[in-house]
Amino acid sequence: MVKICCIGAGYVGGPTMAVIALKCPAIEVVVVDISKPRIDAWNSEQLPIYEPGLDEVVKECRGRNLFFSTDVEKHVAEANIIFVSVNTPTKTRGLGAGKAADLTYWESAARMIADVSKSDKIVVEKSTVPVKTAEAIEKILTHNSKGINYQILSNPEFLAEGTAIEDLFKPDRVLIGGRETPEGKKAVQALKEVYAHWVPEDRIITTNLWSAELSKLAANAFLAQRISSVNAISALCEATGANVAEVAYSVGKDSRIGPKFLNASVGFGGSCFQKDILNLVYICECNGLPEVANYWKQVIKINDYQKSRFVNRVVSSMFNTVSGKKIAVLGFAFKKDTGDTRETPAIDVCHGLLGDKAQISIYDPQVTEDQIQRDLAMSKFDWDHPMHLQPTSPTAFKQVSVVWDAYEATKGAHGVCILTEWDEFKTLDYQKIFDNMQKPAFVFDGRNVVDAEKLREIGFIVYSIGKPLDAWLKDMPAVA
């Protein structure tokens, strides 16, 4: 029986292994993690992450051929194929701080694999890692090999949170990078055979190691670039009276461009886009390519500009101050159908409003109060002037309340900021919300989810990103 072990029970490792277990009933799959609370959650009725369809997959396989354990060394030693799906955050200190990936967890996983292995292993990079990481891992394993053969493969994930299970069931492609040696090709074939249980052969792409590693960074950079491109156009639309939805639709009809990732918004977030672009920037700088590095930096600068532009629009619209005013924030996760708040634009928007002494009431259907307070207590990392992350002043907490109902969040508010495109925000009773707000009542739609005209008929002053401005807003500066 083939045995697979995955180190890391997070957003990538858990769902990926659950689907492999579902599709390959003859393979034993064990997900290991040093965090007991996390593993306990995976073994409970309340999984540690929210992802549509995940519950059903886990419950069907758990205890049959899918297991979650804290006994990391035992299961690593027994496995034929080891996926490494540990966190690779951006470094916050030292060489490359603010840009380079921190491979501390990766290196400790590699050293542990070398320590406990008693048979040949295929080690698969599942985390997003810098180009040439495989080479470094290979060196650690071979220098500590004790006669054991290791083959390193790169098998980057291309999941989108909120649709991860769907993406795993029907992937656009599965990418496997390996050494172009007989042993390397054999390892690639072994992993191909796992995916071939449900993925058509023409969707399984094999490359060399470095191409696979760079493909993941490039894919995320291209996607983020599209978002920053349409967001840059949204600012111009507001200045000229054009409608960004119409522009994006027209542009997306070009078959060379296509319609995806052309929705203007308050900005992109999530664990990957910013981290991977900064990683790409660092690799370019290290390879003497400053022009290329600056090109990709601009994608993040536009994203930061879009968030600050949104905050400035809120403040300038409300008589140039939100001091002491209640602002309802609807949505805190970085996108709908996930509870993930990593790099969510909501953090920067809230910080901007708190900086002007607003009183903020936050509602998100999937994010806990504890998570929101933790996120807001962390200062923004300035990647051009690196310093270690420090908590902000605790005084900010007094201005923030977290509630479990959109109507409670908006009661008595002067303005509403929609920062996540949860479906429920499209169907709220906005007449009821309007009746219970201070007047004039403002809606700042950071995701373009509401029907602005209907809200104006109710009496709201509405700002939608990249759409023709409400008469009230036309004379207000977009950027302070």
Curated annotation (Swiss-Prot):
Native source species: Oryza sativa subsp. japonica (Rice)
Stated family: Belongs to the UDP-glucose/GDP-mannose dehydrogenase family.
Any one GO MF annotation of this record: UDP-glucose 6-dehydrogenase activity
EC number, UniProt record: 1.1.1.22
Protein name: UDP-glucose 6-dehydrogenase 4
Entries under PANTHER family matching the protein: UDP-GLUCOSE 6-DEHYDROGENASE (PTHR11374:SF3), UDP-GLUCOSE DEHYDROGENASE/UDP-MANNAC DEHYDROGENASE (PTHR11374)
Residue numbers binding NAD(+): 8-13, 33, 38, 86-90, 127-128, 161, 272-275, 342
Annotated substrate binding sites: 157-161, 216-223, 256-269, 334-335, 447
Record flagged with keyword Phosphoprotein: yes
Encoding gene, per UniProt annotation: UGD4
Entry-linked Pfam families: UDPG_MGDP_dh, UDPG_MGDP_dh_C, UDPG_MGDP_dh_N
Pathway stated in the Swiss-Prot or TrEMBL entry: Nucleotide-sugar biosynthesis; UDP-alpha-D-glucuronate biosynthesis; UDP-alpha-D-glucuronate from UDP-alpha-D-glucose: step 1/1
Active site per database record: 272 (nucleophile)
Keywords associated with the record: NAD, Oxidoreductase, Phosphoprotein
